[in-house]
């Protein structure tokens, strides 16, 4: 990370203020909201997303690099406002297809649709396929010296850190649907839901309509292959022990 002294170098600041390079153009948009950093002094958050259904690749590198460039541009223009970069892994997503560049494809084929952290590691090294790819991501980013914090979706869901946000989604369900549905094609509208339940029968992530039963308790209802079931999407509620959604 650049030192505060380096960020305040007159020559650098002057160059940054007139630069037409896209990282500075993007940083200026953020500067309008936080000209001197966040009012409470906490770091401005930058975030990248990674889907660990495959190994990290050049696109992964590009996303982290682009975000880092905007982050550094913002730090320069703001005179050194604190920032942090989170590399977020969407490792609760269902496996959509078997990657071409991995061994033991037959093992993965049996787990199509399953959450990535609940699929065995075909390399036989980690707790799951997602854990393996998450480790490869960190190793990949570390090789290039990126300054980041790694966050796993599964860890956040299972620890209950997302419970308050999930309750907020359930409380405001219809308002969210009213915003999202007009943006989707008709086919996707028929199955869209702000949360994706996991089937108790097949253990696959489902894209089906969902009904809120109890927002505070985190209970939802959905069609699981012809059978209506109720399940909980929260981690910290007693009624959610053995929960099947995320």
Task: Please place each PLM-identified region on the residue numbering.
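A broadly conserved sequence feature marking short terminus-proximal activation segments
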Residues: 133-195
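Short, solvent-exposed turn/loop segments enriched in Gly/Ser/Thr/Pro and often Arg
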Residues: 86-95, 153
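The substrate-binding groove and active-site-proximal loops of carbohydrate-active enzymes
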Residues: 16, 52-61, 116-128, 154, ...
């Amino acid at each position: 990370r650049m030192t505060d002294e380096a960020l305040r170098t007159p020559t650098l600041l002057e160059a940054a203020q007139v630069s037409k390079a896209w990282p500075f153009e993007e940083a200026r948009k953020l500067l309008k909201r936080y000209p001197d950093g966040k009012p409470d002094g906490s770091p401005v958050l930058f975030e990248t997303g990674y889907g660990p259904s495959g190994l990290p690749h050049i696109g992964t590198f590009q996303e982290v690099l682009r975000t880092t460039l905007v982050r550094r541009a913002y730090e320069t223009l703001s005179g050194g406002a604190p920032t942090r970069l989170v590399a977020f892994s969407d490792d609760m997503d269902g496996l959509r297809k078997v990657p071409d560049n991995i061994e033991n494809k037959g093992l993965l084929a049996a787990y199509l649709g399953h959450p990535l952290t609940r699929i065995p590691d075909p390399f036989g090294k980690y707790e799951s396929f997602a854990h393996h790819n998450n480790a490869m991501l960190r190793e990949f980013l570390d090789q290039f010296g990126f300054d980041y914090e790694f966050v796993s979706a599964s860890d956040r869901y299972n620890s209950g850190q997302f419970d308050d946000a999930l309750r907020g989604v359930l409380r405001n369900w219809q308002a969210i649907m009213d915003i999202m549905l007009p943006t989707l094609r008709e086919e996707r509208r028929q199955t869209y839901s702000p949360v994706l339940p996991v089937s108790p029968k097949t253990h696959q992530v489902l894209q089906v309509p969902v009904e809120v039963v109890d927002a505070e308790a985190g209970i939802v209802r959905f069609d699981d292959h012809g059978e209506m079931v109720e399940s909980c999407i929260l981690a910290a509620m007693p009624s959610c022990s053995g929960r099947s959604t995320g």
